[in-house]
A protein has these predicted regions:
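Hydrophobic protein-protein interaction segments
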Residues: 1-175
Length: 175
């Protein structure tokens, strides 16, 4: 359902916070959240930065989650950010994809591994109000297995970039 924060433009992030405000007060600043994401995005682009692999549900890029011009710019930003990057991949999971054992996530999640082998792999699971932090080996293994299945069922990065651009063009025509 979501476009990952590390790939969000400031305008898209603000639009999402504005949408959240319709459900009730939020206790954070959209501008500060966007600035933090931009800082983390810069870390991704550093030569010594981390690798980043993301699988995005096709519905997340097709659903009207922001005004059309904001969503269009968001999709083009994602395509440009990932295109040609040796350390980033973005794969779109088509709605028609067949996932091994029909395993689908119940919500968005992230897996963090660290260069230091002494640091444990950590999984965060997104909820409406907070992120759950999982460190138990079996929990982490299950999410790693699920992520592998999602990557296998998703489109290759090149095709995913083409789809992002195609949907952005369609938004321009409809706007």
């Amino acid at each position: 359902i979501f476009i990952p924060g590390l790939l969000q433009t400031p305008e898209f992030a603000r639009a999402r916070v504005d949408a959240e405000r319709t459900l009730g007060p939020v206790d954070y600043s959209a501008d500060r959240a966007a600035a933090g994401r931009l800082g983390r995005q810069r870390m991704l682009r550093r030569p010594d930065g981390p690798t980043y692999h993301v699988v995005i549900d096709e519905l997340a890029i097709r659903r009207a989650t922001a005004p059309p011009e904001v969503l269009r710019a968001q999709l083009l930003h994602m395509a440009a950010t990932v295109n040609g990057s040796p350390k980033m991949t973005a794969q779109v999971l088509p709605v028609t994809a067949s996932i091994e054992a029909y395993g689908t996530p119940r919500s968005a999640f992230s897996i963090y591994t660290f260069a230091d082998p002494g640091d444990p792999t950590v999984v965060t699971v997104d909820t409406v109000t907070d992120d759950l932090l999982l460190t138990e080996v079996e929990d982490v293994r299950r999410y790693a297995d699920l992520f592998g299945r999602l990557r296998q069922a998703a489109m290759p990065t090149e095709e995913s970039i083409e789809l992002l651009i195609e949907i952005a063009r369609d938004l321009a025509v409809r706007s």
